[in-house]
Amino acid sequence: MGPKSRIIHEQPNIENTIPASLYQAVSPERFSLEDDDKFVIYGGGNSYAIQVLQNDPSQELVVCPELESVDYSNVSLFVLNTSLIVWFNSADLGLELPYQSIILHALHTLSDDTFLYLQILSNECITSIPSGTTEFVPSIEIRIVKNDKPGNPLNDNPLLVHNSNSSIETVYEAMSKCSAFHFDSDSEDESGTYAFDSAEQTPALEIPSHWLNNNVDDVDSDEALLRNTGIADDLEIDDVDETGNVNEVAAMHVDVGYASIAGSIRKRDEDDVSIAKARRVE
C-alpha cells in the first residue's frame, strides 16, 4: 500500500527542498529519481483557493477537526516530486496528497475560467462515507482555482518567489510530470509485479507434448524431433534424430591427460600389473 494523505505542520523550505532546475544541474544522473536527502519542487505558487465538492448525494463528507475552520480561499501549492502539498496560509498547516492517492488530475474550463480538478482517495483527513453498499472506491473531488486577491507578503515562501508566472496550467503540467515518477499501487496488487521492476514475468512457452514424448509414431515425418533424455543429448544439437531409436546413447570424447578418472573400479591384482607396465615404459 502506498503513502496516505496526512496533515503536516511544516511547509517545504530552502533547507529541505531544492528547485527541479538546480537538482537536475547538480545531479543529472539521478534526475527524476526520488532523493533521500531533499525534496524537489517542480511547481506551485501562492494565491490559490480550493473547494471540496460534494456532487454525489449518496456519500457523506467528513472533514477532520484540523481542516474544519481553515480558510480554503488562501492557500499555497507545492508540487513536489513525492506529493502535492496544499498549505493553508492562515492556519499554518497543510494537507499532503501523495501522488499514489490522486486518482485523477485534469484541467476544466467553466465560463472562461480554468480550474484544476482533483479526484483523490478517501482518507483520514477528508473521508467519504457511502450511504449504502457500492462497488466503487470512495473518493473526494477537489477544485483548485487561482485567487486574484493579493496575498500577505509574510506568507511568501522563498521557494515560490521565483515562480512568479505560476498558473493553473503550470501546476497541472508539474503534477503530470511528477505523477509519472510513481507506480500505480493498485496495478501492483492486481498483477503482483512492480511497474518499475525490470525483471518482469515472461510468458510461458507452450511446448507440444509429442516433442517430449519418446513415442514418435504420431509425429509427422517432415517434422524433426529433438530428443531430451538427459544423457548429454545437448552436445550435438545438429544431430537431429528422425528415426526415433530410443537405444541410442549420446557421448563425447574427453581427453583427460594424466588425470585420474573418478569412479573407475579396478581389482587388486590389476594394480600390480599396471604398475609393472608403467615401470617398463622408457
Swiss-Prot record:
Primary place of residence? cytoplasm
Q: Does the keyword Nucleus apply?
A: yes
Q: Name one GO biological process term.
A: mRNA cis splicing, via spliceosome
Which key words are in the record? Cytoplasm, Nucleus
User: Where does it reside?
Assistant: Cytoplasm; Nucleus
Q: Which GO terms describe its cellular component?
A: cytosol; pICln-Sm protein complex; spliceosomal complex
The answer to keyword Metal-binding applying to this record is: no
Membrane-spanning regions, if any? none
Task: Indicate the family of this protein.
Answer: Belongs to the LOT5 family.
Protein name (record): Protein LOT5
Source organism per UniProt: Scheffersomyces stipitis (strain ATCC 58785 / CBS 6054 / NBRC 10063 / NRRL Y-11545)
Q: Which gene encodes it?
A: LOT5
